[in-house]
Amino acid sequence: MSFTNATFSQVLDDLSARFILNLPAEEQSSVERLCFQIEQAHWFYEDFIRAQNDQLPSLGLRVFSAKLFAHCPLLWKWSKVHEEAFDDFLRYKTRIPVRGAIMLDMSMQQCVLVKGWKASSGWGFPKGKIDKDESDVDCAIREVYEETGFDCSSRINPNEFIDMTIRGQNVRLYIIPGISLDTRFESRTRKEISKIEWHNLMDLPTFKKNKPQTMKNKFYMVIPFLAPLKKWIKKRNIANNTTKEKNISVDVDADASSQLLSLLKSSTAPSDLATPQPSTFPQPPVESHSSFDIKQKILHLLNEGNEPKSPIQLPPVSNLPLNPPIQSSNSRLSHDNNSFDPFAYLGLDPKNPSASFPRVVSQNNMLTNKPVLNNHFQQSMYSNLLKDQNSVQHLFAASDMPSPMELPSPSTVYHQVFYPPTSTSVSSYGLGKTPQPAYGSSSPYVNGHQTQQISSLPPFQSQTQFLARNSDNSGQSYNSEGDSNSKRLLSMLSQQDTTPSSSTLSKEANVQLANLFLTPNSLETKKFSDNSQGEEISDNLHGESCNNPNANSVHSAQLLQALLHPSATETKEETPKKTSDSLSLLTLLKSGLPTPANDLQNKSQNNERKASSQVKELEVKNYSKSTDLLKKTLRIPRNDEPLEAANQFDLLKVSPQQKSEVPPKRNELSQSKLKNRKKKENSETNKNHVDMSPGFVKILKRSPLADQKKEDTQESDFKGSDDHFLSYLQSVVSSNSNGLH
């Protein structure tokens, strides 16, 4: 039928008869199935009828379906709701599964894409909706053939596909690799596919990172499948590489085995070798190789690297001389112990060197019956060896240095070791002590450093004591005139084992004088509440009674006899007898009566009271009971330091709160030294001597005025040590007598 002059109403009648009136009854009852038929009628109208009649209008599917619903009597019942029916059809159409294929080339770098008929259509893989009761693979084959004209039934793999759901519609595309680039594609449908082309996967959007997204809208139907396609290609390439390696190894082995079999089976040489051209020159005869020789060569080549190595055979040494000649010009080499034996050096038996080697039974040995070296060569070899040895020995013989043979054994060499003294070793120094040896008389002789005697005091304490002793000695300046009494007094103080001398002083007077002076309670319990008393005590030190340079030192000697020998005293106090000058001295000191020199003493007292400022308090501590401490306490300054001597014996009151604040200013004696002295003196003293321990006086100096200092120095220039000593004793006795009263 020709539609060249047909009207639009005639065209609708023809389309209704073709696609709707002849449908089965069950499809006519379903709006969805009727809509599919209306879509087929629309395609026929656009593809064929309008091609014959250009005057017919081009309509869309929605408008075309509305006109057909109104024109066909079977569709009148849905004419009023045809809009709703068409919307239901579109929703149903998007839920129909779609099947297609992705066709790749041999390198899997390009794929086949198709473009719709309209200009606004984009690129996509060939695919289509599945029909009723149609399988997925059959639908994919059919759609690929309709859109591209390529039959992929023999290449499709049902297990290789990409399945996705886009907007509620399931899409499955089967991957078909290995399509040739020379394949000709042509669509089998009318006005559905406009282009079919190969596209490089690297040029597609989202397939490669960091690539500008150009023309993305044209590939919107391809983009969702690119990521899974890239993963599939990667896995496929890895699998192909492994299979290729296996195939290559198998092919190589097969070729090698086939060549080997061909060589073994051939009875002659290979026939493919080029035969020589005939020439006029005479040719050498060519030896014919049998098949056995070829096989032997092949086996030899195959087993060339696996042959066991034959053991190395040593040359026979049975022909060597048993006793090689020894030529020695040195007398030292003639000795058995010093001679050089090459066989012993090599670990061989000198008498039978050949017996030292293991005997190996060898066959086909051509050298067993022949000598390895002739006798002349052996003679020269041994002579050269001995010449070298003799040259070394000759060097030792020519020099004065002994040879290694003449050196003594290490056991006879003695090394003398010197141990230098250490920096921490200090020799102790004590009064009246002699240094003791490091070892006793029974100790063996040791050739080395002997340990020096180390002081029992701590390093800092012994050093302090040593500095104090040096400072005391350096501060003393002795005068040559009128100093005999002072020297005598110091010599008597330094003696420890002084025997009592016969004197006119009675024992009772010595006892009372020693008790008055040495009793610590008299010094500790004395309270000086009045300042005038303290001034009076200090003034007594500068009295005129001490100004006589010609005073007799007998009193000092007798007094020291009583002080140094307290064991001769008695506990009972008796009234002193006035039998000698010392008794009168004791009575005078005890009574505190004025002496003929009281006038000068009163003058000095007045001057001292005018010049005295503030009196500092002292701390009196009892440290030890030894007489040596008393000697250190009673040290009287010389004529060059009168003011210091006067200030040292100012006994003042010390409050309990200030005892902790007053720091000691004199160098304290070490406790260990005092203990040693105490042990020696306890053996000599009496048991009653326990309470007779002197106190150690800690003194704070006071500074008089400058003008008064000059006057005191002028007055004390002619004072002797005995005068100072007697003045000090007088002040102590007077203070004790006042305290007792």
Curated annotation (Swiss-Prot):
Which cysteine residues pair off into disulfide bonds? none
Polar residues: which segments have biased composition? Answer: 268-278, 439-453
Q: Which CDD domains match?
A: NUDIX_Dcp2p_Nudt20
Q: Where does ATP bind?
A: R167, Y220
The EC number on file is: 3.-.-.-
- Domain (Nudix hydrolase) spans 94-227
| Top EC class, one word | hydrolase
Where would you say this protein principally sits, based on its record? cytoplasm
| Cofactor(s) essential for the protein | Mn(2+)
Q: Which SMART domains does the record match to this protein?
A: DCP2
Start and end residues of each stretch annotated as Disordered:
268-289, 425-453, 525-552, 592-616, 654-721
Result of mutating F44A? Decreases interaction with dcp1
Biased composition range(s): Basic and acidic residues: 606-616, 681-690, 707-721
Q: Where is this motif: Nudix box?
A: 128-149
Gene3D superfamilies listed in its UniProt record: Dcp2, box A domain (1.10.10.1050), Nucleoside Triphosphate Pyrophosphohydrolase (3.90.79.10)
Keywords (A to Z) from UniProt: ATP-binding, Cytoplasm, Hydrolase, Manganese, Metal-binding, mRNA processing, Nucleotide-binding, RNA-binding
Any GO MF annotation of the entry: manganese ion binding
Q: Which family does it belong to?
A: Belongs to the Nudix hydrolase family. DCP2 subfamily.
User: Could you tell me what this protein does?
Assistant: Catalytic component of the decapping complex necessary for the degradation of mRNAs, both in normal mRNA turnover and in nonsense-mediated mRNA decay. Removes the 7-methyl guanine cap structure from mRNA molecules, yielding a 5'-phosphorylated mRNA fragment and 7m-GDP. Decapping is the major pathway of mRNA degradation in yeast. It occurs through deadenylation, decapping and subsequent 5' to 3' exonucleolytic decay of the transcript body.
Assembly and oligomerization: Component of the decapping complex composed of dcp1 and dcp2. Interacts with edc3. Interacts with pdc1; via N-terminus. Interacts with pdc2.
Q: What is this protein called?
A: mRNA decapping complex subunit 2
What lineage does UniProt assign to this protein's organism?
Eukaryota, Fungi, Dikarya, Ascomycota, Taphrinomycotina
Query: What gene name does this entry carry?
Result: dcp2
